[in-house]
């Protein structure tokens, strides 16, 4: 882990030199960009399993930050950055199990992320999705029953229907982390 070192640039040297890295903790650095081609250029990027990119200044991930280059991705945390949309590249990794995109804010603390990712249902291995602390609005997608930990708290304008996972919530097989005042429909059990 090389977090908290005030790195402004992503350490591409790790991938240019074909380092065999499977977990990378770069939290709390202030990184603003990951250069395009970082992951497609390395013959060992396929070994990557876990990224902690929290508390940086990222607003996008390069196109090569995806399941094709990193097919064994297990967990990605990009919380506390500056994304206006959920980065979808990691979601095409067949093994992505944990994905966190909490609290996306600009430099003044304004919430940036309002759009629900349209391809979340195409990620069947995803079991934990944390998207709290944003400004999500009406979600019309059916919430995946594969996700068993779903964190949406601190989204004051959210509106969603959980009827398809309500029985799982009642049975204790689905952990919903939410605020009681949120507009959650289709499952009276959560009120």
Q: Where do the PLM segments sit?
A:
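Canonical leucine-rich repeat
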Residues: 10, 34-37, 61, 86, ...
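Hydrophobic anchor residues at the C-terminal helix/turn of individual leucine-rich repeat
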Residues: 14-16, 38-42, 65-67, 89-92, ...
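Beta-strand-rich solenoid/repeat architectures in extracellular/passenger domains
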Residues: 92-93, 107-113
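Conserved hydrophobic beta-strand positions in leucine-rich repeat
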Residues: 1-2, 22-26, 48-53, 73-78, ...
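Leucine-rich solenoid repeat scaffolds
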Residues: 76, 129, 137-191
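Consensus "Asn ladder" position of solenoid repeat domains
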Residues: 2-5, 26-29, 53-56, 81, ...
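Conserved hydrophobic position(s) of the canonical leucine-rich repeat
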Residues: 7, 21, 31, 48, ...
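Core solenoid repeat modules with strong leucine/isoleucine-rich periodicity
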Residues: 3, 10, 15, 21-27, ...
């Amino acid at each position: 882990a090389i977090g908290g070192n005030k790195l402004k640039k992503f350490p591409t040297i790790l991938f240019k030199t074909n380092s065999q890295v499977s977990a990378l903790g770069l939290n709390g650095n202030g990184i603003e960009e990951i250069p395009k081609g970082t992951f497609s250029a390395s013959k060992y990027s396929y070994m990557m399993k876990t990224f902690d990119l929290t508390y940086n200044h990222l607003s996008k991930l390069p196109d090569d930050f995806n399941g094709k280059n990193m097919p064994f991705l297990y967990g990605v945390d990009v919380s506390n950055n500056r994304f206006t949309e959920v980065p979808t590249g990691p979601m095409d990794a067949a093994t992505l199990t944990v994905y966190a995109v909490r609290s996306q804010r600009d430099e003044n603390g304004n919430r940036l992320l309002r759009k629900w990712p349209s391809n979340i249902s195409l990620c069947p291995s995803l079991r934990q999705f944390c998207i709290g602390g944003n400004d999500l609005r009406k979600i019309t997608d059916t919430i995946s029953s594969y996700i068993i930990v779903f964190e949406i708290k601190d989204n004051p304008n959210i509106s969603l229907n959980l009827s398809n996972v309500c029985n799982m919530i009642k049975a204790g097989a689905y952990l919903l982390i939410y605020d009681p005042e949120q507009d959650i429909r289709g499952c009276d059990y959560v009120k």
